[in-house]
Structures are given as C-alpha cells and as structure tokens.
Amino acid sequence: MAKEIAKSLLDIEAVTLSPNDLYTWSSGIKSPIYCDNRVTLGYPEVRRAIRDGLSQMIIEQFGNVDIVSGTATAGIPHAAYISEKLNLPMNYVRSKSKSHGKQNQIEGAVSKGKKVVVVEDLISTGGSSITAVEALKDAGADVLGVVAIFTYGLKKADDMFNEIDVPFYTLSNYNELIEVAREEGKISENDIQTLVEWRDNL
C-alpha cells in the first residue's frame, strides 16, 4: 500500500521533488519536496484508495472508534469520506476558535467521552495534528491517535507525538516516495543523497 500511494502521489503531482531548486514552505523552511494532498481530491480513484487505506488502518490500529475528526482544512474531506465508509459520526477541528458566534474550535459530532481518531492529510512537524489532538482532549475526548496520507519522517514530529503520548500512522512516507521516484527515473543517486540529508538534518 505504501508504495502504491507514493506512486499515485507522484503521478498526480500531489508530491513534487526539486532537489536542486528548493521550495519554501509557509514556515520559511527550504525544502526539496512539496506536498499538496488537496490535489488528490481531483482524482476519484486515488481518493478512494486513500479512503479505503485509512479506513482499514483505523480499524486495524484502533478497533472501536466513536468519531472520525478531520483537521481544518485539508483533513476535512478525507475524514468525511472515511466517516461515510465506516458509518461513523464526524467532526473537524480548526487551528483556533472562531472569533464570532459560539466561538467553536470543534464543529460537528460532540467529542466528550468519545473515542476519537484524527485524520490529517500530511505529517510534517506534527504541529497542526497536535493542535487538533489537544483541542479534542480539552473537549473531553479520548484521542486514540492520528492517521494521515503521508509523512516526511521528520524527527521533530516523532518527538512531538511521543511527548503527548499519541501514536500516528501514515499510508506512505518519505523513504517510500524516494524509492519510487528512483525506480521511475525521476531522481538521480546524487538527488537521493540530497533528499536524505535534508530530512536527516532538519
């Protein structure tokens, strides 16, 4: 599954590699990889594969789940597809509370006392996922863990999830993506070294 998802992400250019002309993330980090999993929404076959893979992952890793929770905004559609497939209630979590109305940070199914799994599109440093986890915990949820489409495999993310004692699982990952890109001739051996060093040194 990890290899198939990595290939799909590369084929539809949801993930692009540029070892010699770095991208700039919104955080200011210079990176040889850019991931925009919102692109998957335009490809029903890829979208369904992600839905089915994450649904199976939730069942296998967490068993009995009460609510599927998406991170705003990119995790919301995938959470909706999964909750429909698993016939579960859904909610989503904003990065911060609204400044008007009821000032809700969480919209949808009530989380208090419920077993919740968070759906994210991408794990980079883990910051947005952990914001969602903490908001759900503050609302009284029992957060079982986080699932996502892809991870860069950054040590910072591992450290942050370990710190809050919440596991995360992804359908594919940076190492798998690099291997698929190598097999398809999209990157050279020198590029691979650049990509690995970037990840290990970040």
UniProtKB/Swiss-Prot annotation:
Its cofactor is Mg(2+). It comes from the Bacteria. Pfam families: Pribosyltran. One of its GO terms (biological process) is 'de novo' UMP biosynthetic process. Belongs to the purine/pyrimidine phosphoribosyltransferase family. PyrE subfamily. Catalyzes the transfer of a ribosyl phosphate group from 5-phosphoribose 1-diphosphate to orotate, leading to the formation of orotidine monophosphate (OMP). This is Orotate phosphoribosyltransferase. It comes from Staphylococcus haemolyticus (strain JCSC1435). The gene is pyrE.
